[in-house]
Amino acid sequence: MTSSSVRVRFCPSPTGIPHVGMVRTALFNWAYARHTGGTFVFRIEDTDAARDSEESYLALLDALRWLGLDWDEGPEVDGPYGPYRQSQRTEIYHDVVAKLLTAGEAYYAFSTPEEVEARHIAAGRNPKLGYDNFDRQLTDSQRAAYLAEGRKPVVRLRMPDTDLAWHDLVRGPTTFAAGSVPDFALTRATGDPLYTLVNPCDDALMKITHVLRGEDLLPSTPRQIALYQALMRIGIAERVPEFAHLPTVLGEGTKKLSKRDPQSNLFAHRDRGFIPEGLLNYLALLGWAIADDHDLFSLDEMVAAFDVADVNSNPARFDQKKADAINAEHIRMLDVADFTARLRAYLDTHGHQLALDDAAFAVAAELVQTRIVVLEDAWALLKFLNDDRYAIDPKAAAKELGPDAGPVLDAAIAALDGAADWTTADIEAALKTALIEGMALKPRKAFGPIRVAATGTTVSPPLFESLELLGRERSLGRLRSARDQVGSP
């Protein structure tokens, strides 16, 4: 097989909100396809009408587009093996089941769960062992009798009486002993196809060569290999694909990261202001590393280096602090104009308005770019520029606006009122002359009260630049208002 013939797939079910573990799987598949020059197939497994939703389907499209994980075949792109939504492929599955039955690879099974348990008990076995392959040996007359009773059979695959083994690209040689996996259902009693059928069936028909998926699906692999082998014998499949079972993503402690964990929600990270580059870099580290001493890399660098054989099989813990730190680095790496545009879009999306024209906003953005972890942090630093959101934090006032702040504010107001021009340089010169030289104050004592009076907090962008952005009138108005409150109960 040439590398360009590699075909991988990402095939989520449209239920709930996209999960970071799911996105990690999509990323590894996408990166492997791009690294090999192969094809990335996006397929929707929407055969569970009770749980699937159009809202979740659209959320999946939104997630992949936001992250920049483009697909070569799939919804809204199409391709030679469509349709790419399983709900639109029902007739294909019925045809495959019919061929499996005709070839003797599958059979109708009428046993109820209660009957299976009763047979296990009668034989002295654990009643929870699962299906016992009883219906394999039914005669035509027995099947006819069951049908006459009104029973609706499921269709089961006839499992081979040999070990099922494969070389997992992540976990190495893996074997399930003969007889350890019973004949499994391919359809419901209604005739509707089950995941156990449609997933391998679609992989075969779409000529998937490599299956990269979560470790939680490892137990289903022997069943799927058996089905691939049956599909090969009836001329539907060309091969059994290579398998790579990716390590579990853990949350707190040793528990698997679940949908109930806040950090599992992809859109929660986007809402906080993660940028795609930062989040993808961190998710790539959940099982893979570009180098032992190198955690920061671009998507292009990942594509150039990624080989699924290098993925570690050990569970990977989602560390929010490390994710934040990596995102902060990627924000710093952005071109200033790019960062400015992204910050503007983020603030607009979240209803955060600043009274700044484009030029002033660009200045403000550059001031905060190296001071934030996520885009959300920028609003906390810049909201003082919005009069409706400006307020002096009581803790900041208690720290910086005590009685001894009065003379400092008086001197600052006088100095700024006399500044010829309202530029950062003029503001800095006026305040340093009045407070550092004139009053012999240390910078913290000199500028702390001014920062709190102007921005409402002890943490802000650089003070002199902040005052220039705020403007002469608003800056002096806030300083005077704060001076009036100094020393009051």
Curated annotation (Swiss-Prot):
Keyword ATP-binding part of the UniProt annotation: yes
Subunit architecture: Monomer.
GO molecular function, one term: zinc ion binding
Positions that bind ATP: 259
Keyword Membrane applies: no
Family, as annotated: Belongs to the class-I aminoacyl-tRNA synthetase family. Glutamate--tRNA ligase type 1 subfamily.
HAMAP family, sorted: Glu_tRNA_synth_type1
Superkingdom of this protein's organism: Bacteria
Biological role: Catalyzes the attachment of glutamate to tRNA(Glu) in a two-step reaction: glutamate is first activated by ATP to form Glu-AMP and then transferred to the acceptor end of tRNA(Glu).
Location of the protein in the cell: Cytoplasm
Entry EC no(s): 6.1.1.17
NCBIfam families reported in the protein's UniProt record: gltX_bact
Class of enzymatic activity (EC top level): ligase
Entries under InterPro entries matching the protein: aa-tRNA-synth_I_cd-bd (IPR045462), aa-tRNA-synth_I_codon-bd_sub2 (IPR020751), aa_tRNA-synth_I_cd-bd_sf (IPR008925), Glu-tRNA-ligase_bac/mito (IPR004527), Glu-tRNA-synth_I_codon-bd_sub1 (IPR020752), Glu/Gln-tRNA-synth (IPR000924), Glu/Gln-tRNA-synth_Ib_cat-dom (IPR020058), Glu_tRNA_lig_a-bdl (IPR020061)
Catalytic activity: tRNA(Glu) + L-glutamate + ATP = L-glutamyl-tRNA(Glu) + AMP + diphosphate
Protein name stated in the entry: Glutamate--tRNA ligase
GO BP term (any one): glutamyl-tRNA aminoacylation
Residue window of motif 'KMSKS' region: 256-260
Keywords: Aminoacyl-tRNA synthetase, ATP-binding, Cytoplasm, Ligase, Nucleotide-binding, Protein biosynthesis
Gene expressing this chain: gltX
Gene3D superfamilies, sorted: 1.10.10.350, Glutamate-tRNA synthetase, class I, anticodon-binding domain 1, Glutamyl-trna Synthetase, Domain 2, Glutamyl-tRNA Synthetase, Domain 3, HUPs
Species of origin: Mycobacterium marinum (strain ATCC BAA-535 / M)
Cellular component terms (Gene Ontology): cytosol
UniProt short sequence motif 'HIGH' region, positions renumbered to this chain: 12-22
Main location as per UniProt: cytoplasm
